[in-house]
């Protein structure tokens, strides 16, 4: 599966334990997303368009209204990267 650079960055952070918090309008549509790393930092690569592409490909999911996290398919499709610590 072809994944863009921004999608890859977001998916990698989600696979390491990050989450995507979302805000909904009154009609139920998501209008704002913020991606947090597991350390609590905000990832600027996570835009609404990147979020919708990951959601359409079923690489992320949410359970019971909780923040979005990487799905098992998303964890399998993310390429290995060196974690810079």
Task: Label the predicted regions.
Residues 2-49:
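Short amphipathic alpha-helical interface segments
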Residues 47-57:
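A short, charged, amphipathic alpha-helix used as a generic interaction element across diverse proteins
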Residues 55-65:
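A short, conserved structural fragment
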Residues 66-71:
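Minor-groove-contacting beta-hairpin "wing" of winged helix-turn-helix DNA-binding domains
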Residues 74-85:
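Short, amphipathic alpha-helical interaction segments positioned at domain boundaries
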């Amino acid at each position: 599966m072809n994944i863009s650079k921004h999608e890859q960055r977001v998916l990698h952070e989600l696979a390491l334990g990050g989450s995507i918090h979302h805000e909904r309008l009154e009609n139920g549509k998501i209008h704002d997303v913020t991606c947090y790393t597991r350390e609590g930092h905000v990832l600027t690569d996570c835009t609404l368009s990147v979020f919708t592409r990951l959601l359409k490909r079923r690489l992320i999911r949410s359970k019971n209204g909780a923040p979005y996290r990487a799905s098992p398919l998303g964890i399998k499709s993310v390429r290995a990267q060196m974690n810079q610590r």
